[in-house]
A protein has these predicted regions:
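Residue-level detector of short, conserved catalytic/binding motifs and their immediate flanks
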Residues: 26, 63, 81
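Conserved metal-binding segment of the jelly-roll/cupin
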Residues: 56-72
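Non-catalytic, conserved peripheral segments adjacent to functional cores
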Residues: 1-54, 78, 87, 92-94
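Ligand-binding loop in jelly-roll beta-barrel domains
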Residues: 68-84
Length: 97
């Protein structure tokens, strides 16, 4: 468990990368009740631009990325936003792709 700070971004935003965690899920619980943007794509060998989706959270709901889900780091809409992160790290395997 640790704290992640999602930075306020300038819009329009260009997303040039996605990441995934092939061996574990990852949960983000917002601490600041600020809206944030979630960008995801289904598990696959490589993310498909046609499958990318984005959602706006009202800041009162958390997000759980299942194992292998492609995602962009959370995007704060108004101000920098803190999240409690629950995940698992593997020392003998590459945990982020």
């Amino acid at each position: 468990m640790h704290i992640f700070v999602a930075k306020k971004r300038q819009f329009p935003l260009q997303i040039k990368m996605l990441e995934k965690h092939p061996f574990f899920s990852q949960t983000f619980i917002p601490k600041d009740n600020q809206p944030f943007l979630v960008v995801v794509a289904p598990p696959s060998d490589e993310p498909n631009i046609e499958d990318i989706r984005s959602f706006i959270s009202n800041g009162e709901q958390g997000v759980n990325y299942s194992r292998g889900v492609w995602h962009f780091p959370l995007i704060s809409v108004n101000d920098d936003t803190q999240f409690i992160v629950i995940d698992r790290k593997y020392e003998d395997r590459k945990s982020v792709v």
